[in-house]
Each structure stands twice: as structure tokens, then as C-alpha cells.
């Protein structure tokens, strides 16, 4: 009989004999021959009347002797049957010491209930995320199937929720920008949107509650010598099971080929943000699990022997790796050298998962790790498949405008660039082939190649730039592997009659490709492109794309925030001709201004404005002028992106039409 059935039967018998003023229980004993002798409280006590019960209750010794004699008879019967197992039901109730029995009953109930509740609460955490995903999937389907319905959500109530819940940063403006806590940026971090923060906070609170609910000390618990040993064991079981439930989920959210991206409409950056928070909570649960189990085992004297067992050694390996992941994944390290972080991260995750499997398999929870491994393996197989079918191609890689890499890769006929999308590039160089970097596509007139751009920063882009710098034209042919395409255009083009694309610096390629793609498909929409750059030289690496805008109905404006800085304009000289005047006192300065003038003439379809734009005023004007729903799509410097988000939230009620905001900035590092 299982413990749960035992307790259920016990409670039933107790209820039957409450009227007699005594407390009985069903007990199982073994005869000397090894056969089971079952004794039970007789239901016939009700028919025999209260006199029998009162005799039993008033003479405890009599009850015991009666039981003893019956047991002896049963034992003899067993011998008489040549050792065959016989069972005899004793109808005389047994009087037990209920005060001594209660701690055993309560202790085993607490232990069993803790396991059951841990599984229920772990399922509850998964159910919470399933609910969030279900809502996101439903909302995404409605947007795609009924775009006009979305446009009708522009009333005061809808705008109230969007202004204070759905669109804004958690604290005033900063979302793409990191929050600096000082100490040389070591504790800097990113805080998501207000809605995302609420989702994360609820998850953290639920996890904290589920880790402690229905755990309490059982007085005189016979299982543990001390209260610390008892509570430590209960908390360790609870947090360990909760942490195990979350592992497949955090692996799923961290994959590039997460099918949920297409169902929910969330971008990779959103899933990565949730991946990080679930991982942080999960590792903290595992650390609490390890600490509380150690406290319990030391209190009971089992620590040294238990730590010699294989499953505990592997559990220790997994916990240590989880702790290093938690520390090493801080924004400070990701920003300093993302490629190094990523390689170390993968190695630590492998040991975390393998160690977790060998720790959990003997405890009956190994299937959770198999689920995590299956999710991870699926992502890797798809990624390798994308790379294999694209093939190793010779790419032309060059430095443009001193701070930008341009990569041109011949592509297979089946491969189509996604407007606003990106691909991961593996450079087949001895020190670089294990690393990959996301590059954003841009639209070109040629259909036989992919053109991608990336700002030169630390890590792989810096290494490529150093390799190209001494070469003629800062250009070389490098064999590459391409993994992609990833991403998709925003829904602004589907939902809005007016679309304003705002790019800052190197955020232009994806914004440009989405803008041009929309212009090719639409004839009745108002499409504007605003590009904010610091220097004139930034135009040099994007001249061809800007010239192509002549063929579209896109209204283009370029802001040059530091127009007085004319350095680096020599890169234009092979494209734009001008006549030098040797009789001028300052021929260099004259040449620069002449060149700028010629650039403007060559791009006469583009409006050039010198100075920094007032984004708030710009947004207000665009919203007031819109004759229908208007959407702002942006990518660029985090400060600019945050400023635009804030301006949109402040102007939702300026027009009777719907105002949307779409952020294409992918913050992975």
C-alpha cells in the first residue's frame, strides 16, 4: 500500500471510530514466517454497539493482549500450511498513541505533498509562459488577418493603454540605452519595455512564491534531527524541481530558429531578453537548491558520503557552470568582446546541460534534459542545413567610410533576402571561422548577390578591418558561409497609410531595404525616409543606394549633425568630379565645399539639412499631417531610438488616426 493510500485509509477509519471516543488505525505487520498479517479496524464495531468499543477503550491492556493472541494464532496457521502465505483479518481494534503517531503522519504528508506541489508549481510556471505566448500569437494573427481592425484601435481607451503600458520604456525614455550604475560600467544593464518588465516581474514573483508556498516546519519531525535539516531538504526539493522545469524553455527562447518567432511576431531580441531573465531565475533556483541541500545533508551527517556519488559530482559541475554563465553573461562582458563571450558561453552551457542530465537522470527527471537537448539539436541542425545549402561562397569585403564593412556575396537562385532582415556570416579565416556575426541586408538592383553592411566595432569586424587596411582599395576576396535569412519587415507597411522610416548612422541598411521594398509594392502610401548622420563622409558607403531612391516615390531627408567636419571626403573624388581653382587662398577648404555642393546636386532628390533634428517636433508634425494611420519604423543609435519611442508615446492623441511605433534595432550583445 502506498503512503498516500495509507493516509487516506487511516483518515477514513478514524472517522468511523470517532463516535466511540477512541482513535484507531489500520496497521500492517509481518508474521514470523514472513507472511503478511493484515489487521484492520472492524466496521462491525458499529453493529456490536458501544459496549464493545467502551470495553476496548477502557482496557488498553486487554486490547493489546487480544491482538497478541490473534497474531499468534495467525502465525501458527502460517506454519501449519507449510510456509504458505496466509492473511487473517483481526476484527479487534487497536488502540495506538495518537500523539506519537501524528508527527510521523504529518512529516510524510509534508514530504509527499512537497513533491506533488513542486511538480504542480513547475507546470504552473510553464503554464504562465504558455499563456503569455498564446496571447501574443492571438494578437499577431489578428494583426495579420485583419489589419483594418488594428487601425480602428485608436480611441482614447486604446491610446491610454498604449501610452502607459504597451509602448513606453519602463522608466521614462531608456530602453535601448543601458542603465549605468557606475563602477566603470561593470553593472550596466538593459531594461525592456514597460509591458515586458511587468511580464518578467510577475514571473519572478510567481517563482519566489512557488518556491516557498506550503513549506513549513513539522513539530517533532522524526525524519530530521534539526529544523534546518528539515526545511533545507524541503526547499531544496522544491527549487530543484522548479529549476528543472524551466531548462527546456530557456533553451527554446535562446535559439535562432525558434518557431515561436513566426507565431508571435516577436523578434529575436525579444526572445533573447526573456531567455536571459528566465536563465537568471533558473540559475538562482539551482544555486538555492545546492545550498539548501548542503545545509540539510550537513545537519544529518550525510554530506561527505553523498558528495562522493556520481550524480552529486555532476550536479556540482552543472551548478558551477550555471554560476559562471550568470556572471559571464553580464552586459559589461558582452559589450567588451561579444565573440569571446559567445564561445565561452557555449562551452559552459554544454557542461551545464550534460551535468544536469547525469544529476537528474537517477532522480527520475532526465527527460527534462532530453527535451532541452532536443530543442538545442533542432536549432543546430537547421542552422547547419542553412549553411550547407547556401554553400561556401567567395565574398568581396571592403572598408567604406573608415568605419563600415561592406560585404557582397553571390547567392543561390532560391535564396531571397528579407526586407529588414539579416544573416550571420562566418569568415573562413584561421582565427575567425568559429565565430559568426549578424549583418543587415540592403536592397540592390542585382538579384544575384547579397549586399550587407556592418559598423566596425571590437571583435570580428575589427579583425576583418585590420586585415583589409593594408590591401589595395581596402578590399579583399574572402570565402564565407552564410546562415540566414532571419528577421522580417515590420507590420507598419501592412497597417499604415503613412510610414516614416527613421535611421541613424549604420542603422540605415535594414531601414532602407524595408523602405524600398514597401515603395516597390505600394503606390498609394506616403513613404518618408529620414537618415541622421554625423559627417558628410558617411554618405560615401551608401551613395549607390541613395541614388536608387530617384526611381521610387520615397521622400528622403538626410540630417548632417556635424556639417563643419569635412574630413574623409576624399573617398568621393572618384565618383564626383569638380574643377579645382588654384587661385583660391584655401584650395583644400574650397575643394571640400565644392565637393559637398556636387554631392547635393547628384542627390537632388534628397533634402539635406545641416544640424540635429528635433525628433519630438518632427513626430508631432508628421502625426498632424497624416491623413490616415501612421507608423514610425526606426533603427540606429540607442539614444535616438529611445527618443523616437518617447516622442511617439507622447503624440498618440494628436491625431484621430492610429499612431504606431516599430523598433528594428536588434540588441543581442
UniProtKB/Swiss-Prot annotation:
Catalysis performed (reactions): 2 a Fe(II)-siderophore + NAD(+) + H(+) = 2 a Fe(III)-siderophore + NADH
Subcellular location: Membrane
Binding site for FAD: 437-442
GO cellular component, one term: plasma membrane
Domain called FAD-binding FR-type: residue spans: 374-492
Gene Ontology biological process terms in this record: copper ion import; intracellular iron ion homeostasis; iron ion transport
Cofactors, names only: FAD
CDD domains: NOX_Duox_like_FAD_NADP
TM ranges: 122-142, 198-218, 234-254, 281-301, 313-333, 340-360, 499-519
InterPro entries recorded: FAD-bd_8 (IPR013112), FAD-bd_FR_type (IPR017927), Fe3_Rdtase_TM_dom (IPR013130), Fe_red_NAD-bd_6 (IPR013121), Ferric/Cupric_Reductase (IPR051410), FNR_nucleotide-bd (IPR039261)
Glycosylation sites: 20, 52, 64, 116, 152, 524, 653
UniProt-listed SUPFAM superfamilies: Ferredoxin reductase-like, C-terminal NADP-linked domain (SSF52343)
Molecular function per GO: ferric-chelate reductase (NADH) activity
Pfam families: FAD_binding_8, Ferric_reduct, NAD_binding_6
Major enzyme class: oxidoreductase
Disulfide bonding pattern of the chain: none
Residue ranges constituting the Ferric oxidoreductase domain according to the UniProt record: 239-373
EC identifiers of the protein: 1.16.1.7
Record family assignment: Belongs to the ferric reductase (FRE) family.
Identification of the protein by name: Probable ferric reductase transmembrane component
Protein source organism: Candida albicans (Yeast)
